[in-house]
């Protein structure tokens, strides 16, 4: 897992290197420019003579990075020009210093974007500190750059992207490549910022973590899947976890089937489904590996299991509400982990007094619509800051929040937060969330064995989200995103674990 930073944290880390360690800001700027130039040359070296590079620079230190990039590339034999945006009177000391050096190196400055047919555009207008909408001449320039038929590279972050939320601040530069410094910024992980960034390379420029900045944001990576423990050789089906799936209203057995299938796909030992009598025959036919209970001896069921899944396809009737409340309260009293999903969340939104049953061992998995019902906010409001939304709900309830979206955010009650970059548009299909619920339950079950180091529930949930995303990516390779179904993700999960 790699640390992600907010704009405020990046500023503090940058300041620590300058003020506490004593590295001059001009040295850090030179390192940053060298890294950008290296990435450009890695792609452009074979066509140096044909390249026409334009570095578009603002008045701040991000602009200074861009000016230094232009100078380095010119000295390496590339035809490079500068285009300056913004008020010259507002230039930072470092930006002006870089302009003076560039002038001494005879880097040309152009006054018109159409002076040449540029093959590469370097965006260094705004850095990560931008929080206001892009307006006026800045907007006009970014709009013109986006229309150019050229390879586009952003310095640290595409201009116009909020570095914390990924929001588009009026207009944003559309990069093919973003070279960001020291740490990936949160806004490069979340849409639409992730889309505007293109491929992201995190460059080491000599800025490192500091005790003065306590990390709380993390990006899960494919290699993290190795943290999931293997099955022990002397185990049995009881050792590998018993999951109770409380799901499926009469005639609605698909969600229960997919949740149970997701759990089996990641190695769970036993699954029992508590569901309506009408679902007995189809579930026994589709998933004979699962046990079924269509009665009402809930206490026996709860005593049997290790982990409870509550909600998929259960409905929001009075009878469903009674069942969900009973299991939430009883699981809380028994200190058993719970995955609360779908209609379980919709019923929680209708009965906020049930939040008293939520603990740090409960994982809620709302999509944006369910999150809106839980928080009273519109989807548009939630999308302005997904990280804050997930963290606030986790802090309020004391439970883990897995906020499902194109980039899923997992937040623990203590504030630690994980973002998954795995997954693809093909996973936006009916039943995908039910599969995730089963996978999450299965992952939590992996850590029940006391021979395995036990991470907190938030970290376990983040690993489950990663596994789900990787399974979807594997399914997309085989099926394509257009034809994927939830069952393909189930099969993908087993393959991911097989090859880890």
Regions found by a protein language model. Give the residues of each.
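Small-residue (G/A/S/T)-rich helix-start motifs and N-terminal tracts that mark the onset
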Residues: 1-82, 92, 188-338, 346-363, ...
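Active-site loop/turn elements of alpha/beta-hydrolase fold enzymes
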Residues: 85, 157, 276
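Amphipathic alpha-helical segments in well-structured domains
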Residues: 98-99, 138-142, 175, 324, ...
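A short, aliphatic-rich alpha-helical micro-motif
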Residues: 115-119, 172, 302-303, 357-358
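Internal gly/pro-rich beta-alpha loop/helix module
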Residues: 118-120, 125-215
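N-terminal small/polar loop signature for handling phosphorylated ligands or for N-terminal nucleophile
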Residues: 68-146, 281-293, 299-300
């Amino acid at each position: 897992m790699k640390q992600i930073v907010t704009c405020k944290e990046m500023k503090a880390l940058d300041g620590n290197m300058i003020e506490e360690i004593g590295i001059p800001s001009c040295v850090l700027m030179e390192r940053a420019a060298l890294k950008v130039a290296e990435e450009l040359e890695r792609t452009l070296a074979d066509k140096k003579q044909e390249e026409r590079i334009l570095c578009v620079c603002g008045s701040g230190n991000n602009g200074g990075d861009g000016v230094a990039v232009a100078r380095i590339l010119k000295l390496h034999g590339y035809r490079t020009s500068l285009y300056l945006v913004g008020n010259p009177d507002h230039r930072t000391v470092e930006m002006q210093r870089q302009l003076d050096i560039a002038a001494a190196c005879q880097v040309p400055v152009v006054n018109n974007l159409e002076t040449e047919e540029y093959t590469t555009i370097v965006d260094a207008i705004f850095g990560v500190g931008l929080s206001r909408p892009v307006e006026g001449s800045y907007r006009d320039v970014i709009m013109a750059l986006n229309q150019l038929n050229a390879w586009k590279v952003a310095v640290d972050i595409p201009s116009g992207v909020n570095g914390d939320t990924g929001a588009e601040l009026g207009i944003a530069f559309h990069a093919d490549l973003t070279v960001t410094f020291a740490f990936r910024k949160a806004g490069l992980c979340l849409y639409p910022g992730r889309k505007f960034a293109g491929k992201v390379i995190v460059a080491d420029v000599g800025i490192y973590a500091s005790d003065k900045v306590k990390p709380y944001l993390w990006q899960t990576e494919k290699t993290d899947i190795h943290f999931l423990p293997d099955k022990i050789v002397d185990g049995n089906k009881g050792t590998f976890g018993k999951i109770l799936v409380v799901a499926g209203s009469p005639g609605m057995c698909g969600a229960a089937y997919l949740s149970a299938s997701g759990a089996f796909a990641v190695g769970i030992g036993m699954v029992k489904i508590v569901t309506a009598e009408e679902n007995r025959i189809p579930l026994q036919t589709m998933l004979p590996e699962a046990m079924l209970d269509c009665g009402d001896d809930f206490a026996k069921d709860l005593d049997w299991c290790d982990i409870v899944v509550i909600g998929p396809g259960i409905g929001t009737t009075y009878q469903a509400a009674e069942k969900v409340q009973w299991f939430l309260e009883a699981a809380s009293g028994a200190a058993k982990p719970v995955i609360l999903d779908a209609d379980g969340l919709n019923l929680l939104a209708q009965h906020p007094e049930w939040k008293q049953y939520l603990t740090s061992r409960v994982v809620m998995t709302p999509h944006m619509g369910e999150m809106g019902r839980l928080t009273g906010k519109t989807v548009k409001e939630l999308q302005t800051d997904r990280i804050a939304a997930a963290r606030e709900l986790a802090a309020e309830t004391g439970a883990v929040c897995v906020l499902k979206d194109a980039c899923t955010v997992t937040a623990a009650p203590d504030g630690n937060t994980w973002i998954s970059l795995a997954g693809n548009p093909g996973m936006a299909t009916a039943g995908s969330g039910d599969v995730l619920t089963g996978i999450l339950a299965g992952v939590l079950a992996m850590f029940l064995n006391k021979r395995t180091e036990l991470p907190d529930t938030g970290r376990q949930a983040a690993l489950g989200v990663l596994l789900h995303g990787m399974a979807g990516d594997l399914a997309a390779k085989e099926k394509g995103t257009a034809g994927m179904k939830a069952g393909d993700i189930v099969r993908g999960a087993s393959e991911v674990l097989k090859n880890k």
